């Protein structure tokens, strides 16, 4: 069996003003997280995630949920672990023994995927992409949860223990 398909998305670009709508469709997502922060150690743990995604027509619900769960794991890594260390223009942690990624113990057991299926006329069968968009909300949701839980406001990633401890110490000094 052989098939052929073509899509001609309605995208616009104005070369004079440099304004464009480069994508035929957009996926929307929002995440809510429950965290636990140990203020003595600066340890941050992601306990639960609620992930709502408008992915168009959901063609494969189990596959879609798997993509979202994988994105949550990637977002967790970006939020608290992944840090490129440079010295004199060279990366000094180019190996996985030095560049940390989340493992099975780090990812929360409870990830509730809320699939919103709004048909999209430009996607195949009305579907939209869901993979990468699922990692984007996690760092911001976790930073917001840290602020809500401890009255500190992280401003950069990753939110490592040492960094959170400095923020906690600064908060406590300001209270005196």
Which role does the model predict for each range below?
Residues 1-176:
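Cofactor-binding beta-sheet edge motifs in enzyme active sites
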């Amino acid at each position: 069996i052989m098939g052929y398909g073509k899509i001609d998305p309605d995208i616009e670009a104005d070369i004079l003003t440099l304004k464009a709508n480069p994508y035929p469709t957009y996926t929307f997502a929002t995440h809510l997280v429950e965290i636990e922060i140990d203020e003595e150690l600066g340890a941050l743990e992601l306990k639960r995630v609620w992930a709502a995604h408008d992915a168009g027509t959901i063609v494969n619900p189990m596959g879609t949920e798997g993509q979202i769960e994988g994105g949550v794991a990637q977002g967790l890594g970006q939020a608290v672990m992944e840090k490129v260390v440079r010295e004199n223009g060279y990366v000094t942690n180019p190996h996985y023994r030095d560049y940390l990624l989340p493992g099975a113990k780090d990812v929360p057991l409870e990830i509730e995927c809320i699939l919103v299926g709004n048909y999209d006329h430009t996607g195949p069968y009305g579907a939209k992409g869901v993979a990468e968009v699922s990692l984007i909300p996690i760092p911001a949701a976790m930073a917001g949860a840290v602020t809500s839980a401890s009255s500190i406001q992280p401003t950069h990633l990753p939110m490592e223990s040492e960094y959170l401890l400095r923020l906690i110490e600064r908060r406590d000094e300001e209270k005196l």
